[in-house]
């Protein structure tokens, strides 16, 4: 793979060609209690990604900068990830099942410039010293020391953008509880994310009418590249 790429080119093409197709359907749970559900078509996905892109553009971030995502797998989480990918910014995910010390170390090692996520998580930022020096935004509200990311959205939905990058450009960094010693993030490039998608597609043989219910949240990225529906 030698030409410039972006994992989002495949996804955004579906936003234009099949805007009415269901992209994501995610139940909202509080413990074992069902609190409702979120659904999103590909057309809505493109519009909301464009809004998040407009907000990210106001944070003075440069291509290659890292953004720490502190949120559960929700529709806003996936929209944020796609907005970051498409602008050449790098989402950083941290396994919240790790010990407090390892979470501290992972945040430091991430070299993130900004933290964006849910109010329910970010409102506890003061308990995590590595977050003290980061800009903090929540995509679902605000709290003391946490700004409302939605206030940065453009008044009119802008055009959806997608920056083409070298295949070796950083795509996604994840810190998990499986590592030992000093936390080391698994670094997936845009090229490797695309190759992973193509490998899964060759093995799985998806069809246009598929509705998939993956157990592994990152597989949602593959499903979106295929243009199929995901129910979590």
Where are these regions (language model features)?
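Conserved AMP-binding A3 loop
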Residues: 39-43, 171-198, 229
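ANL superfamily adenylate-forming
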Residues: 30-34, 120-167
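Conserved pre-ATP/AMP-binding loop-to-beta segment of ANL
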Residues: 19-22, 154-175, 182, 187, ...
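Conserved AMP-binding/adenylate-forming core of the ANL superfamily
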Residues: 3, 20-62, 69-74, 78-82, ...
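ATP-dependent adenylate-forming carboxylate-activation enzymes
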Residues: 71-72, 92-105, 119-121, 230-232
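Conserved AMP-binding/adenylation subdomain of ANL enzymes
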Residues: 90, 194-211, 216-232
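Short hydrophobic alpha-helices that are characteristic scaffold elements of the AMP-binding
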Residues: 52, 82-87, 109, 224-225, ...
């Amino acid at each position: 793979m030698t030409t410039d790429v972006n994992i989002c080119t495949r996804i955004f093409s579906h936003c234009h060609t099949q805007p009415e197709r269901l992209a994501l359907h995610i139940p909202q749970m509080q413990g074992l209690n069902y609190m409702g559900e979120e659904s999103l078509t590909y057309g809505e996905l493109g519009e909301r990604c464009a809004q998040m892109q407009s907000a990210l553009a106001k944070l003075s971030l440069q291509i290659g900068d890292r953004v720490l995502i502190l949120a559960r797998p929700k529709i806003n989480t996936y929209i944020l990830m796609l907005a970051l990918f498409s602008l050449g910014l790098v989402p950083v995910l941290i396994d919240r099942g790790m010990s407090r010390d390892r979470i501290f170390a992972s945040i430091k090692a991430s070299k993130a410039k900004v933290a964006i996520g849910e109010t329910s998580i970010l409102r506890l930022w003061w308990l995590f010293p590595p977050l003290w020096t980061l800009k903090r935004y929540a995509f679902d509200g605000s709290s003391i020391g946490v700004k409302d990311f939605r206030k940065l959205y453009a008044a009119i939905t802008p055009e959806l953008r997608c920056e083409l990058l070298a295949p070796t450009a950083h795509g996604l960094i994840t810190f998990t509880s499986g590592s030992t010693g000093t936390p080391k993030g698994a670094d997936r490039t845009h090229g490797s994310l695309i190759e992973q998608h193509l490998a899964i597609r060759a093995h799985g043989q998806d069809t246009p009418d598929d509705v998939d219910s993956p157990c592994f949240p990152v597989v949602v990225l593959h499903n979106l590249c295929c243009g199929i529906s995901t129910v979590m």
